[in-house]
């Protein structure tokens, strides 16, 4: 995008001051998008042209469902319409797009998840296996915690220490978890 319409208008130069967030959760009932990422605010190194605003729209769907199965061009058109409906951008502001489908992006906590400890105990028997990130740990860690599991693992490997137990303890502190019912 050349410009966001949100917040009285924002271009790449003043984006972080007007919208400091990396992502925005969307709860509007008339759109399907669940989260909007502003890649410029993650790091300027993620954006090839510093005069452009790179955003990502995340849709929480199931692999193989109707939305997942849309051709890329139709999905892009849908997303651009939603940007307009939310007042983020005008269709003419969109310069480029890419569609990425991430299967199993979020762990599922149903079925036999109550037996997860048996799986963890089994994989712990492999001395050279470090389970990291959401998919590796089958745990809903936020991005910071997911990256931290990898960083702690790499540090331990480089130092010759077995830190697999430490890795499993990342993001187990209660203050980091949302609670229902406030």
Residue ranges and their predicted role:
Residues 1-73, 77-88, 122, 165-175, ...:
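Mid-domain catalytic core of redox enzymes
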Residues 42, 51-54, 73-77, 106, ...:
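Generic alpha-helical propensity signal that fires on short helical segments
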């Amino acid at each position: 995008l050349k410009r966001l319409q949100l917040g009285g208008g924002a271009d790449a130069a003043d984006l972080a001051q007007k919208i400091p967030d990396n992502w925005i959760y969307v709860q509007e009932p008339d759109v399907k998008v669940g989260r909007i990422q502003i890649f410029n605010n993650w790091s300027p190194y993620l954006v090839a042209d510093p005069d452009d605003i790179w955003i990502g729209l995340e849709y929480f769907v199931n692999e193989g469902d109707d939305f997942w199965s849309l051709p890329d061009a139709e999905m892009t058109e849908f997303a651009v319409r939603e940007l307009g409906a939310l007042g983020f951008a005008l269709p003419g502001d969109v310069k480029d797009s890419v569609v990425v489908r991430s299967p199993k992006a979020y762990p599922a906590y149903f079925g036999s998840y109550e037996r997860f400890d048996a799986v963890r105990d089994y994989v712990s028997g492999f001395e050279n296996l470090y389970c990291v990130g959401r998919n590796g740990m089958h745990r809903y860690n936020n991005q910071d915690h997911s990256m931290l599991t990898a960083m702690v693992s790499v540090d331990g490997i480089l130092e010759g220490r077995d830190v697999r137990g430490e890795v499993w303890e990342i993001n187990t502190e209660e203050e980091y978890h949302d609670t229902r019912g406030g």
